[in-house]
C-alpha cells in the first residue's frame, strides 16, 4: 500500500517489539512506511519505563477503525484451535467514533515523531453509520485510567439483567469486586470467562484466583477457557 501511494504510519511499542526482526522494519521503511517505536529506553527517563503502548488499533482512511485485543504476531494467525493460536476479538467501527480512535493514535504518534498529522486525509467528515451511539475511551500513563475505570464501574452499577466479562488478566481492585458482588446480589446474572490452563502469565492467574472467593459466594459464575490462551478484553452489560 505504501508503494502505491497510501500514507502508512505504524507505532510499535519499544518493549513489546524488542524481539522483532529489524529486517522487517527496514523492508517496511524502504517501501515508504513510517515506523516509530513508542518510548524507547533512555538512561535519563528510567522512571517512564512502564509508559507503554498496549493499544491494538487499525484506522483506514480516517473512516473505518478496528480495535480489540489482537496484535500482529503468530499467535493471531490461526483460528484459536491450537495452543499456539490465541482466542481473541476485534471490532469494526464506522462513524464519528473513528475520529476518536484516530485522535488516540495521533496522540501517541506526536510523542514518538513530534509531527502532527492532520487534514481531511486523517480527519474526514464523518456521518453516523447507524443508529447505535458509540464512544471511545482511552487511557495512558500520563492521562491515567480513571475515565475507563469510571465507565466500567458505572456500567456494572447500572446493570439490571446481565454482565458478561471476558478478561485475559483479571486482578480487580476491591471496589470493582464489590460492584460485581452487589450486582449479583440484586439479581443480575454475572458471568466471567478467564484463561484456563493455557496462559501466558501464571503469576496473574494465581493472583486472579485469590479474588474469586467472594465473587463465587455471591453467585458470580466464573469459567476458564480451555482450548488455548484466552486474550479477550470485553464486557457486555444487559
Residue locations for each model-derived region?
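Charged, low-complexity intrinsically disordered terminal segments
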Residues: 1-238
Amino acid at each position: 500500500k505504501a508503494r502505491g501511494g497510501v500514507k502508512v504510519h505504524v507505532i510499535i511499542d519499544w518493549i513489546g517489539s524488542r524481539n522483532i526482526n529489524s529486517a522487517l522494519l527496514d523492508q517496511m521503511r524502504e517501501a515508504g512506511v513510517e515506523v516509530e517505536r513508542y518510548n524507547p529506553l533512555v538512561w535519563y527517563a528510567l522512571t517512564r519505563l512502564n509508559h507503554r503502548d498496549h493499544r491494538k488499533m487499525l484506522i483506514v482512511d480516517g473512516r473505518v477503525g478496528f480495535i480489540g485485543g489482537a496484535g500482529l504476531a503468530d499467535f493471531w494467525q490461526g483460528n484459536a484451535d491450537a495452543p499456539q493460536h490465541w482466542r481473541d476479538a476485534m471490532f469494526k467501527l464506522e462513524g464519528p467514533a473513528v475520529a476518536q480512535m484516530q485522535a488516540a493514535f495521533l496522540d501517541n504518534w506526536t510523542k514518538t515523531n513530534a509531527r502532527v498529522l492532520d487534514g481531511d486525509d486523517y480527519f474526514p467528515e464523518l456521518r453516523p453509520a447507524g443508529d447505535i451511539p458509540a464512544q471511545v475511551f482511552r487511557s495512558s500513563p500520563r492521562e491515567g485510567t480513571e475515565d475507563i475505570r469510571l465507565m466500567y464501574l458505572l456500567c456494572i452499577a447500572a446493570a439490571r439483567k446481565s454482565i458478561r466479562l471476558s478478561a485475559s488478566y483479571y486482578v480487580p481492585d476491591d471496589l470493582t469486586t464489590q460492584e460485581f458482588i452487589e450486582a449479583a446480589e440484586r439479581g443480575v446474572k454475572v458471568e466471567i470467562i478467564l484463561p484456563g490452563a493455557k496462559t501466558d502469565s501464571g503469576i496473574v492467574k494465581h493472583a486472579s484466583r485469590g479474588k474469586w472467593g467472594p465473587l463465587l459466594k455471591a453467585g458470580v459464575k466464573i469459567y476458564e477457557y480451555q482450548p488455548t490462551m484466552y486474550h479477550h478484553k470485553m464486557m457486555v452489560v444487559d
